[in-house]
From Swiss-Prot:
SMART domains: Ribosomal_S27
List of residues binding Zn(2+): C31, C34, C49, C52
Species whose genome carries this gene: Methanococcus maripaludis (strain C7 / ATCC BAA-1331)
Subunit structure: Part of the 30S ribosomal subunit.
Details of cofactor binding: Binds 1 zinc ion per subunit.
Zinc finger (C4-type): 31-52
Biological process according to GO: translation
Protein name: Small ribosomal subunit protein eS31
Keywords: Metal-binding, Ribonucleoprotein, Ribosomal protein, Zinc, Zinc-finger
NCBIfam families: PRK00432.1
Annotated Gene Ontology cellular component terms: ribonucleoprotein complex; ribosome
Cofactor(s) needed: Zn(2+)
């Protein structure tokens, strides 16, 4: 028989928000395809959505300043 799989752990969504007084600020970028409830992962040179696979590349600041 195959080994039993453990329970999946979920991320704490409260870590993705910053609350100051009555204002709430999102700390991570939201996916434009999935909507406001899905956050994108930030990698070295891109943002990626784990749900739909949408990817946005960051602009390279060095090449823009050299031109």
């Amino acid at each position: 028989m195959a080994a039993k799989k453990g329970a999946k752990t979920t991320t704490k969504k409260s870590d993705y928000y910053k609350v100051e007084g009555n204002a709430v600020e999102r700390l991570k970028k939201a996916c434009p395809k999935c909507g406001a409830g899905v956050f994108m992962a930030e990698h070295l040179n891109r943002f990626a959505c784990g749900k739909c696979g949408y990817m946005e590349y960051k602009k390279n600041e060095k090449t823009e300043s050299e031109e």
